[in-house]
């Protein structure tokens, strides 16, 4: 698995729906943020799927050509803090067939996510953590 840096920020623009964490671990939110980013990335020409829940946050599948990247959105320690990162997995068959990994695609999707967040006036204190 390859992972991007983590982006953290503050925003009150992504409301938490009642019972949203029933599909994740308790206290883990981010569905509205995942949907918002999916829309913004789609407007930039990226093929994005619907937001779906995992135990660690809300995810969106992003496709560029034949490569796929997962975008993960989750809540932070306070109601208005959020974190976002991207990752890609290279399956056993990809390695066996010596297909190249999706590192370049991961970087391109991460840059697009960062650009979307940077351009949004509702996003404050955006920080990139390694």
What residue ranges belong to the model's regions?
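Aromatic-enriched hydrophobic runs in primary sequence
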Residues: 9-14, 26, 67, 95, ...
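Structural alpha-beta junctions
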Residues: 34, 38-47, 114-125
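Short beta-strand
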Residues: 50-53
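Intrinsically disordered, low-complexity regulatory regions enriched in serine/threonine/proline
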Residues: 101-130
């Amino acid at each position: 698995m390859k992972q991007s840096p983590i982006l953290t920020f503050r925003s009150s623009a992504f409301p938490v729906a009642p019972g949203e964490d029933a599909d994740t671990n308790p206290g883990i939110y981010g569905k509205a943020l995942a949907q918002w980013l999916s829309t913004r990335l789609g407007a930039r020409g990226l093929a994005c799927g619907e937001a779906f829940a995992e135990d660690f946050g809300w995810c969106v599948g992003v496709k560029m050509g034949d490569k796929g990247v997962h975008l993960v959105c989750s809540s932070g320690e306070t109601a208005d803090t959020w974190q976002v990162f991207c990752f890609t997995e290279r399956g056993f068959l990809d390695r066996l067939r010596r297909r190249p990994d999706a590192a370049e695609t991961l970087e391109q999707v991460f840059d697009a996510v960062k650009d979307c967040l940077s351009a949004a006036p509702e996003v404050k204190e955006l920080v990139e953590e390694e």
